[in-house]
């Protein structure tokens, strides 16, 4: 019965994603999927994300070897977005990641520069068993973003700030290089949101063998993180799905000014 439920659900997902892709032209188009472990035949949670584009956005898998960045090394993200900067707290963990197949000879297709940063990193798993699925672009309410603007290059210039917020494509690199558990990865990302903010809103999964967390931020520094249970399903096509939550629940972490 569980297998039948999942097959029907995945069939619906494929039809929905195909319909959504058919109406999408040159836009951020992704669909995030979560199926709790109780609804999966193998008994483990199912986390996925489709990119609803044509074949020119096929993916290439890579491995970032352990120690690529040493403790104290300075990371500079893609100049196209600011860029975000980070000093590694320890030698980086080994992790897998994938990028678009338009990444040639070390040239980043986003900024056109030959740089050390990874181009549009979306998903990966590190040697500690931590997985991150990111780049589910969201859109914040204009009234909210006026009160808590995105910490992008324009904001940094207007506020004379030397740092900008994290861009969604840098999230997998930083979390997978640094975090030894899902909980540690969640704390790190939320600390970054609080201290540096974000360039744009997004939805992010951070999980390991024990926990699956889903984080949404729809303005510069505000966020909600929820530890997902095993009896739920959700499908998210570039839209925030977290609604009313109990901020006192031990499975919910929210920014203090939310």
What are these regions (language model features)?
Residues 169-170, 183:
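A structural signal for well-ordered alpha-helical segments within the folded catalytic domains
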Residues 178-184:
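Short, charged, surface-exposed loops that flank catalytic or proteolytic processing sites
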Residues 30-167, 188-258:
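A contiguous strand-loop segment
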Residues 19-27:
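C-terminal segment of classical bacterial N-terminal signal peptides
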Residues 172-178:
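Short, well-ordered beta-strand elements within core beta-sheets of diverse protein domains
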Residues 7-18:
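Sec-dependent N-terminal signal peptides
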